[in-house]
């Protein structure tokens, strides 16, 4: 068989000629003829797979290299299409210079130009030319820039229009206009171009030039960039894909929002118009309402001045008439006015406005404002409404959108991966071909060697020597460069992933050719052909290079490094000091490091294979492809041409005189020493601290110190760089990215130092901050996170461009449509003393800012402003489009990518797992030194301050020789850790390790319980005492040492437990053996598992002791009181419980133990905890006015304290100190009880007013934490959180470091510049105009009235800590406006700000929001979700050990088992009832009712506030009509269904709704008179319950049901998280009441929202759970004195002042936000994402819940008595009646017989047997089915115990065979009888003839039996002849013996029958 691709010498590209066209026509004709012929054979046609276009020959792709080089003369020329798919299409392809494919139609363009026409060919050549697309791209960009300018002459527009027209003409000439394949208008992107051009001409043609609408369409030109850049099209595809996927979520969201909007409409309509109005009755002194009085009253309540404004704002104060609503101050009344707040746009007055408000709530945009307004107007109890909307609406729906987008993204990713894998497979098959051929030839016995000689091997076009030359420099590069691999730049990464060369993140697919790490596989043959066989798989190469330098593992043994050998220390050393030896040298273990050998075992084509010429030639052709692929890769990899490479090698590798070499050696030693890295790291940290110490108002001495520090550090880092350059040579130094990074920073620092004298360059100073990132070298988490952000930015390159285009387009649209409106009407929305509003669209920059702000999620306020100045409809459409498109889709795609890079690049990647970095080595050495010193001191004082060490003295390897490899460092480090444990670093250790390093095929199985890497323990403090020395890391292969250590232990008798450790050992042994067996599979427990610390190997007494609490539970006896350590040190603690006094003590302990373990005791304690927590809620602001309550609380406080102390003492006695104090929950109890005890004692001793005691009293708020350990649900969540804490902390640290850079920049830019002069008039603070006050001295000078104050903005950048707070407000988008305005207005220190003086400072915040806010906050989501997934894997049950197939079966079966056939409701006998029954059970009836429910919902939407009396009347009538209809429906159903009506949940629901509706009608009539006392809104809401009935419709909508199913699945987990959140809120609200009851009312704190009572605190905390409005609550707490507050104001409880305490406030709010917003809310997201995935998987399974429901519903019709059986005759109809995948349409008799179903007497079949068979029919054959079937049968038998147990007596197949046999026998017998009668009536002429003819029946029967036995048997469970005893059926009897006997008796029967059948007839 010839090699499929041909060789590379020949080219596969052929010109497209008229002959080619003729060929195509012939093929098309042939195809049509074939089609006609096939039309007759329909069935075959269905089975045949339709051809599809080849993936790698798609348009815009490049054809793979193996198609050969493209000759220059064919560039841009029409060529025959390579893709077989297009062989029957009239098309041809054209390749440009970059080999990119374009396809064109071969028909005439515009009916004129054939493909061979000169004009068309020129047009084609131009259109595919790279310069053409470049020209168009540049034009578009220039045009975009032009559009951002406000005034541009029209002439420029004409130029652009002409260019676009020219482009369109060329494309139309080349492609044709629209009729044919690949024509101009067949590409949707060209529609865009076409519309842009057409609109431009229409705009010019019409005289209506004023239509700015048409001009806006020019903006669409920006979208043309998408059509020019190919990568963008893909991303847009993904976006469109995800928008499609969002359909279901959108429907669900609209439905939920509509329901909530209706509820809001009924509850709150008209309420927001209630305002505090001056009491005008007081004005009318006469008090009698004359007509004049009325006029005055009207005038009074209409006038703006008569509204009372909220202090500090210009908003009128809202109020309500309810008891818990907001109240008005004295002299004001609460009245309903005509306007709503916020320009009259915020209201619930009609459905549309309510819907907008609800949408705003869902997107959480300034929802705290709506929340406060509504609660103030309606009452605090309506907080419940907001809780529901925020948790169910906002969190759930918004996160569902995230889940859907993530899913769409992953699906597309998966598709790409599948594509790559398909490609790999083809290559693999290609490689296999020669081998198969070889086998065939060998089988034929042909001597292959004599067949061919390998002379004409078609080698690739580039000669081998050139390739060798090119590879050599790369070997040397590889030898020093750890990081440099083809994955370096994103382009290559994409290229490689396209070829399957992924970065090793994805598991290597089996036998993939393409998984290798470096492109130069230098396993060179003499002739330079790469042997493709030697690709050590990804894992192996990683193992190989684990402890040696990056490059070694791939180099073959034959190559010599071109670098000079040993005298040059740089020859083979990686920059981190890992020796990467020149190949061929020996690694330190004395073992040759040759991954070549390792790889050889996995070769596809080994070297010996190539010896035989015939095989070699075959392989060469394979190799030629492979090398070409590699070459392609190499070309993309090579950054510079060969001439530059040789230049670099010549001049950038410095080999001079021996002295220089000596200097290099010395420097090399210094630079690569681990301590050098430690020093550098410390310097970076200290330097960072120095930079963070800058602040406003530094003393000159402090400033000088910082300056000197800066110089010192700059010098240090410069020296480090110079040393490294000398030690490594520039050539190698600059190949590491870190070094380039260092070099840039050092250079910038030097420039800054030089320039500092001339003037401060604060911009350059910020560059020094980037040094922080150098920490990433030694801090894996930071490294990983930077990588994640890097990966995302790489992958997001295209997405970022799309986002930029969206922002750009919308900013332009806004500017074009609304710019003039903003200019003309700006007075409507700007502040009184400002020229322009802050946010407008008059120029491009401000327009961009508005769009950016919408993307941040703040759209509503700008939209109100826009609606004030422009057309309302345009504003609504524009803002909502940006919001939905930009915010929801694009930002979610970002998040999806971030999450994706998390799953790809785990926080513990293998790279960090195996590699020990120098920092850890240095720390290990220090630790070892510390141990030695400690030991020496102990020996010196010779007293047992510590337990004696084990005897074996370790030989420490501390001084590492210069040439040491990383392996040795690793060993040294391990020795350093292991040394105190007494492990000697023996030869065995070295050998084992070397073996592990050099032989990648050794499996190292590590027990799951051990830490992530051998050196994790180093990260703990170095103070392990002797107890933990056994837990030290024990190296692989050291079990014998461990056993010795174990045996060396003495096990003292433990006095408490009554049995010694040895006694326990046997008990434990048994217990743990089982555990070990259970764990084995989890540990991959094969024989090769060499788990060092496995418990089974040796029972460590300490382990036993650690397990004692568990055993104690089993033994029902208390533990020891003290730990073993205490007993050893204080022998007096040992007691003998058999002696007198201790016996009594032991009995007491046992009694206490029983009390404490009793469930009632626990319940009592929980009750007490709840009561004591509840009592804390009463200690509020008003407590001093309630002396009785106060006294009661004091008394109960003492009581609770006594009870808890008693509980603690009981537990001490019962559990012993050891168990009590080793339990974290007990510690928590202990601390909280102590706090209560101390505060109680202080109170008794009259010290309660001391500040520290007061602080302690506030800590009593922690009491509810004790409930945590008692409630299982919360405990689970807390455990999960605690598990996530390490990674959350890691991310938090990284975020802090990221933010540190921005904070320091902020300090550099804004320190001290936020000061301003304000004028305090009444409660309102206004900025003094710049014309009056210019600076701080003016402010003091002008202060005649004493109302001028020079103040600083409360949240500022005066120091780094304050900067962090400012950044937190910016990142959460709360309070960021004030900070931003201050920054933009700031001029300089002590100068009065000027409006937008520094407008481009906005960009500082934009950049921070993108990197600091967006990335880092999303990293939290990523980390938390990632962490939960890992925890789930650890705790995972059977799912992890199940294949995907098994899971599908398992889930299908799970659903099966839970269902059983139900009896249908019998039809009533009474004919009237029967008639109604028929109506009610028809589907049409249900549909009519549904339509009515929808109509009812619509009529409810029509209601508005202040509607006319007429409308109210009509709506009431309609409402009564609907109530009547639904009542009628209810009555009819009850009449027809009798008592069965209440068996259906939906019916009960309907019944309740009807009763409530009637009730509300009756009440509303009665209560019209009492309306003042009782609000009928509640009854209105009850009517809404009807909407719930719409949910019944949802059964039809599968997608939406999946989403609701996901919600139902999430509910338990969400409830637990909600409980935990409530607990946190409870604790914080009590803290708040204790700390901030007296703060002044301003910003977010007022008479309703404050920390004075428990209820008010909860209102505030619920609001900031979503981080909304926390800046407003924090603002008054930051006040420290005038003008904002008065520290001497007396308070009700005797304390003074209404100022806050900033430190406590900041701590309180930041911790609460981190806990609630970042953690709890993110857990919510994690749960929803998880369950959404599960739900989608379930819904995408071939069989869903509905299919089984449908099965049983159909079954009910065939089995009305619910006997669980139907007759065989009914089966065919039944199978045909089913719907969905289970249906088997008629004719189905044969299929059903083939299913071989068991029959019971009466020819009946059991429902479960049918269901199994049908399920098997859908899912196909599988081994797992049988075991699952057994489970389901058990379940089913348990739930449906039938009275009689039916035994199957046959199966359908056997029944059919018997049936056929019977017919045959009957026929034969009849013919025999007939024959016989004939012979009797006509006696034969020849008497002997009868003997000659055999009786016909014998032959017949024999033939028929044979034939029937050979009937095809699909099921393989029962054969035609017999029943095997193992046959499973539901209907089987209970015991196995019965089964055996029945089947054997059947067998006997069988044999009997067959004998009878084959016996000759009479």
Swiss-Prot record:
Start and stop residues of the I repeats: 116-414
Stretches forming IV repeats: 1465-1764
Protein name: Sodium channel protein type 10 subunit alpha
Phosphoserine sites (modified residues): 450, 453, 476, 488, 621, 624, 1458
Species this chain originates from: Canis lupus familiaris
Residues bearing attached sugar chains per UniProt: 284, 288, 321, 344, 828, 1319, 1335, 1343, 1693
Transmembrane segments: 126-149, 155-174, 188-206, 213-232, 249-272, 383-408, 669-693, 705-728, 737-756, 763-782, 799-819, 874-899, 1155-1178, 1192-1217, 1224-1245, 1250-1271, 1291-1318, 1399-1425, 1479-1502, 1514-1537, 1544-1567, 1580-1601, 1617-1639, 1705-1729
Chief place where the protein resides: membrane
